[in-house]
Amino acid sequence: GHTIIDYENGRPCGCGRKGCLDMYCSIRGVVLTAQEMVNGYYGETKLKDIEANTMTTLDIYNAAVNGDELAIEVFRKTGETLGKACANFATFLSPEAFIFFGGLAKAGDLLLKPAKETYNKYILSLYKDKAKFLQSGLEDGTAAILGAAAVGWEINK
């Protein structure tokens, strides 16, 4: 989340740096992207009816699944950013899969389809079409506990 992806004009992050992936590919990041895009959008969109300070990712998701072009574009842009970050990550770790968890991952193909397409556009040809993009089936709050347990298991082997 705190890998810098925008060195020039990055959004300020709570960690104290600017341009962190988390400020673009998270629940908060999606809202910020939507707020930025609404300001210059001249077409019809449900997002214009929502006060900027009350807009949520769920609002954007609901608009997208109901065909709102701007909301769909927000998820596409977020997915593209995520796909580029995954391509960079895969260059030095070559994972078999990326497993996404949490509120934003619940957007499913709205997010993951453009992420995978962009990943395949930017990844080394050696890795193209090899990594899977999966949505976790774990319950909220379970991933951190299982991850910590797995680390403990590996340390004690």
Describe each PLM feature range.
Residues 1-6:
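Short, intrinsically disordered, charge-biased short linear motifs at domain edges
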Residues 7-12, 17-157:
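ATP-binding/phosphotransfer module of carbohydrate and carboxylate kinases, centering on a glycine-rich
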